Regions:
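Accessory nucleic acid-recognition modules appended to NTPase machines
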Residues: 3, 183-355
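Conserved lysine of the Walker
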Residues: 39-40
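Conserved catalytic/switch belt of AAA+ P-loop NTPases
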Residues: 90-113, 120-122
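Hydrophobic anchor at the beta1->P-loop junction of P-loop NTPases
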Residues: 28-31
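N-terminal pre-Walker A segment at the start of P-loop NTPase domains
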Residues: 1-20
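Domain-level recognition of nuclease-like catalytic cores that cleave nucleotide substrates
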Residues: 395-422
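Interdomain motor-coupling "hinge/lid" segment immediately C-terminal to the ATP-binding subdomain
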Residues: 2, 112, 118-228, 232
């Protein structure tokens, strides 16, 4: 695997083999994700071609709008921020239909291009779509490739000694997030300035490319209110009221945040249609640093002092869990579970029809009652063997059994104390 250069550090993206495989199979590979996740750097590492165009360049953008076919003549070619010129995708389609060969086009975009109907229709049967998440902590630090410890939880022969242990520092990673430029900034005050600039760029450029928004201040207020509800069930009526927006406008703005790869609505898990379950999704952000900045969290002390610190720990660990899912989206899914009596499990990992239930705790102490939600989930499942195991991820350092079926495992390796600095 080639290494890629991000600012002053060499970083190997776990995602790279998946992009390379896609390019061996299909004529078009579409790589999406939030701005500043490293899509361009990854694309150039996968396909070191001289034919590279970015539609952030006004000259290239004008060429794409006036003569899109001219950008498809030299192949293989990388075209960045392709959502800025949807007609260009039609030219790509024509080029593929004239001479179909694998790996001809690598397109990137800061928008989920599947939601743009004209693009999705044009590339049907010609493209593989991949979504690059921001870095998770262990990927940034170059540790434990491909999140093997999470995969091992699905195996019957998993042993406690395999689970990594180490000092954790979730507020550190909550504030850092996973955008490479932000991760390179060593102090919180400078990082806060960067996050503010990021939001302005998103509002003034990326958002307007996706849809007309009549009031950017209204949209930013909605972002702040949504960030303050990180990890919670989405009550759209309450969110609309607090943001002083209509429900239809709130729904549309949430759709735009999701289409822009900024936020996601985590869907609830159900295995038994007769059980009374909550069907409302939960809100999580693709980048925990952005979410915490929007919510007004400016320091590690402020994060740990919050009454809702548990939700922010969940958001921090979600950074790793979404990476786990993104590495194999066809066979992996991420859910949560909650019934109408309030029993819940924070995250459910699904892999090829089998499940691992995870409960998240900030505490350094854990006891069997902390797994009560996992036990309740197990009781509702028709196929109880499908739930391979449950685990309470907690702030201590000792992996151990809580019961015959459930484990207590430290989350420290997923948000480690970073001895390497920035």
């Amino acid at each position: 695997m080639k290494s890629i250069h991000v600012v002053n550090k060499i970083k190997t993206r776990w995602f790279q083999p998946h992009v390379e495989k896609a390019m061996r199979v299909m004529p078009v590979t579409v790589l999406t994700g939030p701005r500043q996740t490293g899509k361009t750097t990854l694309a150039k590492a996968v396909e070191p071609t001289d034919a590279y165009y970015t539609l952030d360049d006004l000259g290239i953008l004008n060429q794409a709008l006036q003569d899109p076919a001219s950008l498809t003549l030299e192949q293989p070619v990388i075209i960045d921020e392709v959502q800025r010129a949807p007609r260009l995708v039609l030219a790509v389609k024509h080029a593929v239909d004239q001479h179909r060969r694998a790996g001809a086009f690598l397109l990137t975009g800061s928008t989920n291009l599947l939601v743009i109907k004209s693009i999705a229709d044009s590339l049907a049967g010609r493209a593989i779509y991949l979504q690059l998440p921001p870095f998770c902590p262990t990927e940034w630090l170059g540790r434990e490739g491909n999140l093997h410890p999470l995969d091992r939880l699905f195996d019957a022969d998993f042993e406690l000694r395999e689970w990594p242990v180490g000092q954790g520092n979730w507020p550190l990673w909550l504030l850092r997030g996973g955008f490479p430029p932000a991760l390179e900034i060593p102090n919180e005050s400078d990082r806060n300035l960067w996050m503010g600039a990021y939001v302005q760029t998103y509002l003034e450029r990326d958002l307007r490319q996706l849809s007309e928004v009549s009031s950017l201040p209204d949209f930013q207020r909605l972002m702040v209110m949504a960030a303050q509800r990180t990890g919670r069930l989405l009550n759209q009526a309450e969110l609309a009221r607090d943001a002083s927006l209509s429900q239809p406008t709130t729904h549309r703005y949430l759709n735009l945040l999701e289409a822009g790869c900024i936020m996601t609505r985590l869907r609830p898990f159900t295995s038994n249609p007769t059980t009374a379950l909550i069907k409302t999704p939960r809100l999580y952000w693709r980048d925990c640093g952005l979410a915490s900045w929007l919510a007004g969290i400016r320091s590690s002390d402020a994060a740990t002092a919050r009454m809702d610190a548990g939700f922010w720990l969940e958001q921090t660990l979600f950074q790793t869990l979404q990476t786990w899912q993104a590495l194999d989206p066809q066979s992996r899914c991420l859910h949560f579970w909650r019934d109408r009596s309030g029993r819940e499990v924070d995250f459910i990992l699904e892999k090829e029809g089998r499940f691992v239930a995870l409960e998240i705790k900030t505490s350094k102490q854990v006891n069997p009652s902390d797994a009560s939600g996992i036990k309740a989930l197990r009781e509702t499942m028709k196929n109880k063997k499908a739930l391979v195991r449950g685990a309470v991820l907690y702030g201590g350092n000792e992996p151990r059994h809580l019961s015959h079926d459930d484990l207590a495992l430290p989350w420290g390796w997923m948000a480690p104390e970073d001895s390497e600095g920035g």
